[in-house]
């Protein structure tokens, strides 16, 4: 029996998560040279999301297919349609022009860099240089491992990665994770560095005050982990930008991640109503416990 579902991923999914929490979101990315999938993308972005794209020559719009075993939703294999070569210098200039236009009316920049050729080292530096609050997710995946690095994002305000990505970046299998967070924060001149650890929760390190914050994993049931990091980054970036207490910021974003893993892929955006109910329930329990 075959069943097919299709969702927005990556930056599109992040924008959908943000929609319930901000007045307006700008989305900048690239499509294939024939603008394939544009109709689908438009139909799945809400009215609060203003989008602009460049067309990448000799490339399709990125599609990632996962073939999943029906009973327990276990991934059997994946097939990617993409051209991960770098955008041309002309295409990058178009990106820079569009970015400058968006940034005039923006307070917060969220960069989701999946290593598929959109963001060069030079372009990453220009994003950081705009003096906005910049939060970054640099994902290591099967198509970019060995080539993708956090080093392009020196001086960003916030970076979120998972533990495997942290250990890969630092070339360390056994070092205490807190030591790695301190060292990487220093190397990249970051204030906030967050590492997610699956069932072990998440750790936030604030280099400014040299303090660690910890959160448990709140998901009772994990249907699919895809997109959990993006969901967490979306809301955590807002919280840290608004200078919400780090403990509370990490708690809120961890609850968002737990929402994300309860559905397949990026099928559902973070629900603000559900989040507030869960937060109220947790804080009530915590006050009673104390």
Protein language model regions, located:
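Substrate-binding N-lobe of the ribokinase-like
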Residues: 1-62, 93, 277-280
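Residue-level signal for inorganic ion chemistry
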Residues: 18, 109, 159-162
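Short, surface-exposed connector motifs at secondary-structure boundaries
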Residues: 19-26, 104-108, 188
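A structural signal for isolated positions on well-ordered beta-strands in alpha/beta enzyme cores
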Residues: 26-30, 52, 108-110, 135, ...
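Conserved phosphate-binding/catalytic loop of the ribokinase/pfkB sugar-kinase fold
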Residues: 53-59, 64-103
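Non-cysteine beta-strand/loop elements that form the S-adenosyl-L-methionine
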Residues: 68, 155-164
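Conserved phosphate-binding/catalytic region of the ribokinase-like
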Residues: 86, 105, 112, 119-155, ...
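A generic structural signal for short hydrophobic patches within well-formed alpha-helices
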Residues: 166-167, 275
